[in-house]
């Protein structure tokens, strides 16, 4: 029997509401590492159809070099990380489940050519989201993904997969996830030989830019909420050198 899109949407809505009630938990990931990798690859394919990827420029090489320097200092080695630059003026960086990490051109322009420390902290933060499985935990609460991956529900079309890419780009993390990724990213940067104070400089630049633009919230801040307590916590972690290797 052919099911209509409205039937598919209703099924997804019901499952998304019922799943947390059945499990009693919104923070557990129901995706295996293999499923995370598969989901990330599909999301990356969709994103790279929408945005032009910078492959061979000095900026692209810089991003790959910093990413490769961070990787030996993390504990989750079972995913194939990649580091790419997307040609968009948005000030943002995103990481997908399973390892794809994207730095947006607008972010590189804001940081300039010399502050590798700040860029390393930002990329470490994004790696922290992957390592902490933050996106996978959120996506697990949306049974649309599980239906696509596990059951092949009729109606899961390329349009659904394109929407999945948009979900990755606009995924808003919880306060706890942001603090966890800050801790992880600062630790990765520190042990890779970068100055973790680069993260504070980045936060301060974002705040100044936001004030100059009349309070208009930049893309990174929309998906990575920033507040005074978060900045203070990062400053305290750096001051106390409370870095944890591989976490």
Protein language model regions, located:
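Sec-dependent bacterial lipoprotein signal peptides
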Residues: 1-23
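A Zn2+-metalloprotease active-site environment signal
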Residues: 22-247
């Amino acid at each position: 029997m052919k099911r209509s899109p409205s039937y598919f949407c209703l099924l997804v809505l019901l499952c998304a509401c019922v799943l947390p009630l059945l499990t009693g938990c919104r923070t557990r990931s129901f995706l295996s590492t293999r499923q995370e990798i598969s989901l990330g690859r599909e999301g990356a394919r969709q994103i790279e159809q929408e945005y032009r990827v910078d492959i061979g420029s000095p900026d692209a090489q810089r991003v790959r070099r910093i990413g490769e320097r961070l990787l030996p200092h993390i504990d989750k080695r079972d995913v194939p990380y990649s580091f790419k630059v997307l040609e968009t003026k948005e000030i943002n960086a995103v990481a997908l489940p399973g390892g794809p990490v994207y730095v947006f051109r607008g972010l590189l322009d804001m940081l300039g050519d010399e502050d590798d420390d700040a860029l390393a902290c930002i990329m470490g933060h994004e790696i922290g989201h992957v390592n902490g499985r933050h996106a996978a935990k959120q996506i697990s609460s949306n049974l649309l993904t599980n239906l696509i991956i596990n059951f092949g529900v009729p109606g899961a079309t390329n349009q659904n997969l394109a929407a999945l890419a948009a979900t990755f780009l606009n995924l808003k993390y919880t306060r706890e996830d942001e603090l966890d990724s800050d801790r992880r990213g600062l630790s990765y940067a520190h042990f890779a030989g970068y100055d973790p104070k680069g993260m504070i400089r980045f936060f301060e630049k974002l705040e100044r830019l936001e004030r100059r633009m009349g309070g208009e919230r930049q893309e990174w801040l929309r998906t990575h909420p920033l507040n005074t307590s978060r900045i203070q916590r990062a400053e305290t972690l750096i001051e106390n050198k409370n870095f944890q290797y591989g976490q």
